[in-house]
Amino acid sequence: KINKNSLILYDDRITIKKDLSDYFKELNLNSIKKLIINFDPNLKFKKKHITYDLNYRNQLVYNSNNLKIYNDSKCTNLNNAIYKNNLINSVNKILILGGKFKKQDKNLKYNITNTLVLIFGSQKDLFINQLKFIHSNYFKFNNLNELFKFLKLIIKFNKYEFILFSPGGESYDSYKNYLDRGNHFNQLIKKVLL
């Protein structure tokens, strides 16, 4: 036997849902309104609260009057590495690429202009095949340690303004992760410059 007083009609359930929904929308709007009304325009935010501190993402690791070195070990995409390199407005720059190559469209070639490109790792030829060198040269190395022996010589005898370590490949070929690779790069920079 069904008690008629305990039944909620279908239309009544819809009405109750709508009323609850309207109530929470109004409650939300009132909360936002309070925030806006009470907002202090002189409020200062600490930088770390509004930005992400990603290790080895465009990290300036060396800065002298003549040379800036950036560690962007987090970059695992060739397109991003080339894009960042092209943002540097200088003909005296070095781009360091390497790592485990991510598959790309074989017909797509990235233009690299006015740059000395140093490429390390077992898949260095895959990187070279994706690049179109315009007023640029490249050298290949088996690993980052070999690359740094060469780098030490060329920065001693040539004037470069920028060195960008933006590998454009994954780190798993030789490192535990991009943090491990970025840390290794920073250690090698200290050895070369000191």
Listing of model-derived features with the role each one plays in the protein:
Residues 1-21, 173-179:
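Flexible active-site lid/hinge loop adjacent to a nucleotide/diphosphate
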Residues 76, 99-102, 123, 164-172:
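Short glycine-rich anion-binding loops that position phosphate/pyrophosphate groups of nucleotides
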Residues 77, 143-146, 177:
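Alpha-helix N-cap recognition
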Residues 81-84, 127-131, 185:
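Hydrophobic packing residues within well-ordered alpha-helices of enzyme cores
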Residues 167-194:
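Glycine/aspartate-rich loop-and-adjacent alpha/beta segment that forms the canonical ThDP
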